[in-house]
Amino acid sequence: MATTIARIGSANWAKLLVLLWLVQLATAGEPNPACKTLPTVDKDNEDKCCDVPEMFPNETLNACMEEHQQSSKPPLQKSCEITTCVLKKQSLIKSDNTVDKDKIKSYIKEMVKGSDEWKTLVEKAVLEECLPLMDKDPSNVLSKLKSSLGDCDPAPALTIACAAAKFYVNCPAKDRTKSPMCDEWRTFLSKCSNSLEDLNAIFMVLENQKTR
């Protein structure tokens, strides 16, 4: 799981699911019922649903993986720490562990390896859609999640998971794969990536599938 937390640059539909596993919330509000049933998952299909540009340098990803991957901590906590590590190494998190919105905006313009259309999409997803979700949090799910993550603040990792879903939903036509599976997932994520409760519902379904 942790290997793909920050590798949005080459993400396909399966990697998006891995990102959404970050959203393990102890308790939450009521999700959209439609988010409790996942679309078709073809594990043998490696087609990309969206060709997302590189977001973070490989050397940063590898350094954070080496630093945290071999830890004996629970997988969810390691994933949170790896994501936070990547953002810190890129100077995108303040000393109080909150995401630095001004630096995020500059980073997108200077470092994201994509077209202007992609940079606009990333900026909107992170700054206008996902970070505000963290601020709203009517069910206090972030504070409930912290109890299972040690000293790792879940908000940065949740922001990454949320943004990945938005990238898939709004993927530019030239970078989009047209297939029944991809179309089904885009429709699903357009409904189920707008609240922490909905993201949690996706996680719970995935966890149930893993234990079968």
Swiss-Prot record:
Residues 1-28 form the signal peptide. GO terms for biological process: sensory perception of smell. Keywords: Disulfide bond, Olfaction, Secreted, Sensory transduction, Signal, Transport. It comes from Anopheles gambiae. It holds the Pfam family OBP47_like. This is General odorant-binding protein 68. InterPro entries: OBP47-like_dom (IPR054577), Odorant-binding_protein (IPR052295), PBP_GOBP_sf (IPR036728). Belongs to the PBP/GOBP family. Disulfide bonds join C64-C85, C80-C152, C130-C162. Present in the aqueous fluid surrounding olfactory sensory dendrites and are thought to aid in the capture and transport of hydrophobic odorants into and through this fluid. One of its GO terms (molecular function) is odorant binding. One of its GO terms (cellular component) is extracellular region. It is found in: Secreted. The keyword Nucleotide-binding does not apply.
